[in-house]
Amino acid sequence: MEKISVSAFLLLVALSYTLARDTTVKPAAKKDTKDSRPKLPQTLSRGWGDQLIWTQTYEEALYKSKTSNKPLMIIHHLDECPHSQALKKVFAENKEIQKLAEQFVLLNLVYETTDKHLSPDGQYVPRIMFVDPSLTVRADITGRYSNRLYAYEPTDTALLLDNMKKALKLLKTEL
């Protein structure tokens, strides 16, 4: 019985030593990764265009759209999503998109809203939708995919520009 107790005790000591050593090695290894660099403060743009004016919440964006009589452009994305990252890079670097975006109330969301009109064909990212100042979701302004109507790829900049212009043009003819 004594041999079993001593063996169990030694096994526990060895196991706890191994686990303790693993946790102390991991933080040292992280020093070389990009995670250890000081992070820049997060802005509302989240990298989609720092010079643009972005709203913080969906409710604030709807209010600004209605009071300013500008259409609302909503970008649904995730920080870890490679498709979202690729679209963000193209969106932020395209001068024509950035210039046209100034005529919109802008909101980018990394979470879903409670408004089911903003996900008529499912919750996927990246997804760009437009809402006019009368607070009507513009379901007619779609991307090129039939299974993800509001999805855009980095190669879809011309289509996105056309849809942004369509949102502005139809806004003027509806009022």
Swiss-Prot record:
Subunit (UniProt): Monomer and homodimer. Interacts with LYPD3 and DAG1 (alphaDAG1). Interacts with MUC2; disulfide-linked.
Function in brief: Required for MUC2 post-transcriptional synthesis and secretion. May play a role in the production of mucus by intestinal cells. Proto-oncogene that may play a role in cell migration, cell differentiation and cell growth. Promotes cell adhesion.
Endoplasmic reticulum listed as a keyword: yes
Keywords: Disulfide bond, Endoplasmic reticulum, Proto-oncogene, Secreted, Signal
Top-level taxon of origin: Eukaryota
Encoding gene per record: AGR2
Keyword Secreted assigned: yes
UniProt cross-references to Pfam families, sorted A to Z: Thioredoxin_7
Primary localization: secreted
UniProt similarity note: Belongs to the AGR family.
Chain span(s) of sequence motif Homodimer stabilization: 45-54, 60-67
InterPro entries, alphabetized: AGR/TXD, Thioredoxin-like_sf
Designated name of the protein: Anterior gradient protein 2 homolog
Signal peptide: 1-20
GO-annotated molecular function: dystroglycan binding; identical protein binding
GO BP term (any one): positive regulation of cell-substrate adhesion
Record localization: Secreted; Endoplasmic reticulum
Residue segments, region Required to promote cell adhesion: 21-40
PANTHER family attached to this UniProt entry: ANTERIOR GRADIENT PROTEIN 2 HOMOLOG, ANTERIOR GRADIENT PROTEIN-RELATED
